[in-house]
Amino acid sequence: MLLRFTKMHGLGNDFMVLDLVSQHAHVQPKHVKLWGDRNTGIGFDQLLIVEAPSSPDVDFRYRIFNADGSEVEQCGNGARCFARFVQDKRLTVKKSIRVETKGGIIELNIRPDGQVTVDMGPPRLAPAEIPFQAEREALSYEIEVNGQRVELAAVSMGNPHGVLRVENVDSAPVHSLGPQLEVHPRFPKKANIGFLQVLDPHHARLRVWERGVGETQACGTGACAAAVAGIRQGWLQSPVQIDLPGGRLHIEWAGPGQPVMMTGPAVRVYEGQVRL
């Protein structure tokens, strides 16, 4: 059978989006890996699937698969594209929608200027909720990688993140340290690793090594986690502009127990069909 799909991106973080509300199919990890190959398939960072909700309290179910076939809890850039997709496909006429994900419920708001604001919910900071192996919650943790001590913050935005402060993201060891920290045993479910450069209290640069993907042009949940870590440490103040290789995100966080609000673009690239 042929499935209709849309290719989209949020700041260069690219997605294949499938509507499984009006289409019916069982997508397996082998299909995701086949389609995700940039040489022989469609090529993407993540596959986003739109499904009917399992509860009357939400509008849709939102599932996310990395290009390696693994299903993950959350994707902030994908959430913005999800909101734009369901509007463009007339799956809803609402400007504000509630969506269930593996990492919890999020709220998406489409603004008149085309930007999308995502209420990511409050960050999870307790080690057991991230998950991260530590005896107690702290602003930062020291872990060892190949005999080297690394200090990082641990934050969950529905998915686990480690955030390191660096002097300059251009020279940061993203491709050497990133994959080692991603699979560090203190992150039982692996982690996305952010390298944060603070420019001033309201402006920072960020590169992210994403779990199961590698470095991407942008990571929405990574930007949220970096802003939270920076605000908790006193390096940053809300609102924060986070510059990623693919562009800029606007992050707001009022403090513990409050939701993180992320605003940024969502762009449709092309429509296509793929054989299942």
From Swiss-Prot:
| Highest taxon above the source species | Bacteria
Catalytic residues identified in the record? 75 (proton donor), 219 (proton acceptor)
The reaction(s) annotated as catalysed by this protein in its Swiss-Prot or TrEMBL entry are: (2S,6S)-2,6-diaminopimelate = meso-2,6-diaminopimelate
Keyword Ligase assigned to the entry: answer is no
Annotated disulfide bonds: none
Pathway per the UniProt entry? Amino-acid biosynthesis; L-lysine biosynthesis via DAP pathway; DL-2,6-diaminopimelate from LL-2,6-diaminopimelate: step 1/1
Q: Where is this site: Could be important to modulate the pK values of the two catalytic cysteine residues?
A: 161, 210
Compartments reported by the entry: Cytoplasm
Return the InterPro entries for the record: DAP_epimerase_AS, DAP_epimerase_DapF
Protein family according to the UniProt entry: Belongs to the diaminopimelate epimerase family.
Designated name of the protein? Diaminopimelate epimerase
Question: Could you tell me which species this protein originates from?
Answer: Pseudomonas aeruginosa (strain ATCC 15692 / DSM 22644 / CIP 104116 / JCM 14847 / LMG 12228 / 1C / PRS 101 / PAO1)
